[in-house]
């Protein structure tokens, strides 16, 4: 199931270079001006997209290419002041990740790299040295906090170590919070901002989407405005979002600062949701050397056909389809929006096994296991979005049953459904879209009321799906790294959610265009082409 890529050796030196831009343009400050803006104290509000998070983590060299840091360098030409970012000097191996008291913090792995020897993205091998306990307790101009939702920026204790141990704080803010009870906004306002960028809001819907809809849409809950009832993967209630967003912006402009607010991207257009096809099951993918193609497909269809026949008796036969050796066949997935037919399947399967009509003898426990899996199973359609994380599931074996013939029979995505959390179905997509539209309406209304500039990242990244041409003539795309073919155009990092250095430069360039137009400024743009793309290594 792995793709094979060809790489060109002479490019390796360029590819393996550090994350600093390799070309510096000479800029004559006399030809540029700040217009109606004052960049003497620029602060950046946001989440991981603001922090410079990429390749699945926040690491030292990656942070240097955060879009706020890129902007700050351009602002210096027109009177911009110092710009500080949370220190990552203790990330001595430049691999990111996170420790707590010297032990790995679950879910905080090292950065992803493309291993050229295996043609696959892998976590970089290396020792994690970044520790939550190294607390700077200082406000920084880049106030992007990976994982933060809108309401988190106003929450006291979001940087408290005791709250972190209770699962109620953020390790990145714990490292910088000036006190246990401070808020992100309280700390950033001590820097007396004169200009800001505010790109917060994506996580208010993204966490739900990247979990395959495992959370709740709080807009559908009776107590949807009660934050104590929220789970990490929930969609934020529109009322909560509005109150938090207005509070953030009101705080930022309270001292006279001007700025740019950015809309929430349609997360379903990013590579995390568009890379894995719904129909990757082909003859080439499942027939091994030496196997007979007809025999393989015949055996698979014997099993699928039996389940289809059972579901037909229950009026749901269209949930499944037989595999065609000449076509790209869809994945078998779980869909929790379907009626659960587990009880009925349990009864019918037991009858088939007892009568000897099932291919192998199964115990009652094994029958229950299969009935549970197929109770809400169906074949995927083109409308389903397979998560990037589903790649590792396809064709994978289930936990051993102790019965070799059963283990060989059930393969994830082929003859046993991939779990619902690896799929964003149509119902879940509609919830994501509704929330995104509502959030962006709020963002634009607040910007209009306060006279702020708007960088429409939703529109920009949606257009990038088909390719966007910029001043250097290059076309940049919102797709996943596919090899040398899109090495110089891909904007997303290997996690499929966050941008790579080139992508963040692309964002910075768009924000500069917005600033120049709205605030009648003339600030030099940046050239994304001189920033690195995916991180490739010969071996890991």
How would you label these PLM feature ranges?
Residues 270-451, 455-488, 502:
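Acidic, Ser/Thr/Gly/Pro-rich low-complexity segments that form flexible
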Residues 95-107, 120, 132, 151-177, ...:
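Surface-exposed intrinsically disordered loops and tails
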Residues 2-5, 9-41, 278, 521-540:
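Bacterial Sec-dependent N-terminal signal peptides
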Residues 58-243, 268, 273, 387-388, ...:
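Conserved SGNH/GDSL esterase-like catalytic core that processes O-acyl groups on lipids
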Residues 40-56:
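Catalytic nucleophile-elbow at a beta strand-turn-alpha helix junction centered on a G-D-S/GDSL motif
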Residues 67, 71, 481-538:
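Histidine-centered active-site loop/cap adjacent to the catalytic His
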Residues 30-38, 177-194, 249-254:
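Short amphipathic alpha-helices and their capping/turn segments at secondary-structure boundaries
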Residues 191, 244-261, 435-455:
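A structural motif corresponding to the C-terminal end of an alpha-helix
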């Amino acid at each position: 199931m792995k793709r094979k890529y060809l790489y060109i050796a002479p490019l390796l030196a360029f590819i393996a270079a550090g994350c600093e831009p390799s070309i510096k343009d000479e800029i004559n400050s006399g030809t540029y001006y700040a217009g109606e803006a004052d960049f003497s104290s620029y602060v950046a509000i946001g989440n991981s997209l603001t922090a410079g998070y990429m390749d699945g983590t926040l690491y030292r060299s990656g942070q240097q290419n955060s879009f706020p840091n890129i902007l700050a360098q351009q602002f210096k030409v027109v009177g911009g002041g110092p710009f500080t970012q949370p220190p990552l000097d203790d990330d001595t191996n430049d691999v990111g990740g996170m420790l707590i008291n010297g032990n790995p913090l679950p879910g905080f792995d090292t950065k992803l790299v493309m291993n050229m020897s295996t043609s696959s993205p892998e976590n970089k091998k290396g020792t994690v040295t970044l520790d939550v306990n190294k607390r700077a307790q200082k406000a920084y101009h880049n106030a992007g906090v990976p994982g933060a939702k809108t309401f988190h920026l106003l929450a006291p204790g979001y940087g408290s170590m005791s709250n972190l141990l209770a699962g109620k704080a953020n390790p990145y803010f714990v490292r910088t919070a000036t006190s246990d009870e401070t808020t992100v906004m309280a700390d950033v306002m001590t820097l007396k901002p004169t200009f800001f960028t505010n790109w917060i809001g994506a996580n208010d819907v993204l966490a739900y989407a990247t979990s395959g809809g495992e959370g709740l849409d709080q807009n559908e809950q009776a107590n949807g405005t009660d934050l104590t009832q929220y789970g990490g993967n929930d969609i934020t209630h529109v009322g909560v979002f509005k109150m938090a967003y207005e509070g953030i912006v009101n705080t930022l402009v309270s001292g006279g600062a001007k700025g740019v607010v950015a809309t929430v991207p349609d997360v379903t257009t990013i590579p995390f949701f568009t890379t894995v096809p719904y129909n990757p099951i082909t003859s080439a993918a499942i027939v091994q050397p030496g196997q007979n193609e007809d025999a393989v497909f015949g055996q698979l269809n014997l099993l699928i056909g039996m389940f289809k026949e059972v579901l037909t008796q229950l009026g749901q036969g269209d949930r499944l389809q037989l595999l065609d050796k000449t076509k790209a066949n869809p994945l078998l997935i779980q869909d929790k929006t379907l009626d659960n037919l587990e009880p009925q399947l349990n009864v019918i399967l037991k009858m088939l096994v007892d009568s000897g009509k099932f291919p192998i003898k199964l115990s009652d426990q094994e029958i229950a296991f299969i009935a549970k899996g197929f109770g809400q199973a169906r074949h995927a359609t083109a409308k389903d979005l397979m998560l990037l994380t589903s790649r590792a599931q396809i064709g994978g074996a289930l936990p051993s049953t102790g019965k070799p013939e059963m283990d060989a029979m059930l393969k994830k995505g082929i003859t046993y459904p991939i779990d619902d959390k690896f799929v964003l179905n149509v119902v879940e997509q509609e919830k994501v879209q509704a929330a995104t539209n509502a959030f962006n309406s709020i963002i634009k209304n607040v910007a209009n009321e306060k006279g702020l500039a708007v960088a429409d990242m939703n529109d920009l990244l949606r257009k990038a799906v088909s390719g966007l041409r910029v001043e250097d003539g290059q076309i940049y795309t919102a797709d996943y790294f596919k090899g040398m073919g899109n090495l110089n155009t891909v904007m997303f990092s290997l996690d499929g959610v966050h941008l790579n250095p080139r992508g963040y430069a692309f964002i910075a360039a768009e924000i500069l265009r917005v600033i120049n137009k709205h605030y009648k400024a003339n600030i030099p743009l940046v050239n994304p082409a001189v920033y690195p793309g995916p991180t490739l290594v010969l071996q890991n």
